[in-house]
Curated annotation (Swiss-Prot):
Pfam families: DUF383, DUF384. Belongs to the HGH1 family. PANTHER family: PROTEIN HGH1 HOMOLOG (PTHR13387:SF9). It comes from the Eukaryota. It comes from Drosophila melanogaster. This is Protein HGH1 homolog.
Length: 369
């Protein structure tokens, strides 16, 4: 502890560059272990020094400071500690504003590490509303973040910005985040949709699919999702589609974007993501109107072929079961189902509902680790 405390004096903005760099390199190494993180988190003056060095004129020093924050915010309790201390300082260290500013700065060398810090902070559900307050303070911030995510060459210093996907996914943990994502004012969801099939990054793809699942769990948005002018259903189905040929009769049911797919078309390779997509469809089966729309758009036909592929190629039992859960509903006549709304007429035990949320949160976290 004393050794860590002694480093603080060398991490002041006006200190010699070589001393700052050596001290911060040591601190960054400490953040890689649970013991080191505990020691640093117990010293407010050390955290304050790290905050200050994120603004250092030397890019290597600034980057090491931000990388330290990534490690220090990787667990919920620690993330809360960092967030609260940053807020309590006089003047405050505006960690969310700084992150958003760096992410949306096309010339920033630190956009990727700052996006990972913000991803860690937004993962903590108890912080999401306060983070949204900050992001909404300026009407331009959310649209700029969406633009930075949607435009692959946005950052001129070659930052990938893949972690914006889990940031948006984390924000949609809460109803306010889902509302913002679906609101016409920002049209965030439409900008994010293409990346549900993005082959270049499982983090970007997984975060986008997580957004879709969070929105699908909220029946308020089912009409938006299933609107004929919306591309959301296509974004959910496309990763589940393969190169199989359909009869003309079946093809007429499918959305035009999913008709006559090329022989090179492949399905989502990650079984956890396939399962999340299938769970999206299961949630969309909650009302009679939604079920009828799904049937009319060839969802059963797509899942019929998908099930054959999963049984022979994918071979994931959880995905097979998730597919069968949807198919079992779609093949039934409404008279057999006898319910207009599964969610209001069939009560899901609270502990089971909580388990679903925890499992999904754990999976998204596994993508980031």
């Amino acid at each position: 502890m004393e050794t860590v405390k002694e480093l603080v004096q060398f991490m002041q903005p006006n200190q010699r560059l070589d001393l700052k760099a050596v001290a911060l390199t040591h601190v960054l190494g400490l953040t890689g272990s649970s013991e080191g993180k505990s020691a640093i988190l117990s010293l407010d003056e050390m955290l304050m020094a790290i905050f200050g060095l994120t603004f250092d004129a030397n890019q290597t020093v600034a980057k090491d400071a931000v990388l330290s924050l990534i490690n220090l915010t990787s667990e919920e309790e620690a993330a809360i500690k960092v967030f609260q201390l940053a807020k309590q300082l006089q003047p405050p260290f505006a960690i969310v504003e700084v992150a958003a500013k760096e992410i949306t700065n096309e010339q920033s060398d630190l956009a990727d590490p700052w996006s990972m810090v913000l991803s860690n902070l937004t993962r903590v559900e108890s912080l999401v509303h306060e983070i949204l307050d900050t992001l909404e303070r300026d009407d331009h911030t959310l649209p700029r973040l969406a633009k930075a995510f949607a435009q692959l060459d946005y950052n001129k210093k070659k930052a990938k910005l893949h972690y914006l996907a889990p940031i948006f996914c984390n924000l949609t943990q809460v109803s306010r985040g889902r509302e913002l994502c679906c609101h016409r004012k920002y049209e965030l969801l439409e900008k994010l949709l293409p990346f549900a099939s993005f082959e270049g990054s499982v983090v970007r793809r997984g975060g986008t699919i997580g957004i879709l699942k969070n929105v699908c769990f909220d029946t308020v948005y089912h009409d938006v999702i299933l609107n004929e002018q919306s591309s959301i259903l296509v974004a959910i189905l496309q990763p589940l589609c393969g190169p199989e040929e359909f009869s003309d009769e079946d093809n007429e049911l499918l959305p035009i974007e999913l008709q006559y797919l090329p022989e090179s078309k492949t399905r989502e390779e990650d079984p956890d993501l396939r399962k999340m997509l299938l769970e999206c469809l299961l949630q969309l089966c909650s009302t009679r109107r939604s079920r009828e729309i799904l049937r009319s758009r060839g969802v059963y036909e797509i899942l019929r072929e998908y099930h054959k592929w999963e049984a022979k190629v994918g071979k994931d039992s959880d995905c097979l079961l998730a597919c069968e859960n949807v198919v079992d509903i779609l093949i039934k006549k409404e008279e057999e189902i006898g319910l207009d709304n599964y969610k209001t007429e069939v009560e899901v035990p609270a502990e089971q509902s909580e388990k679903f949320v925890q499992e999904d949160a754990a999976y998204v976290k596994s993508l980031l680790d």
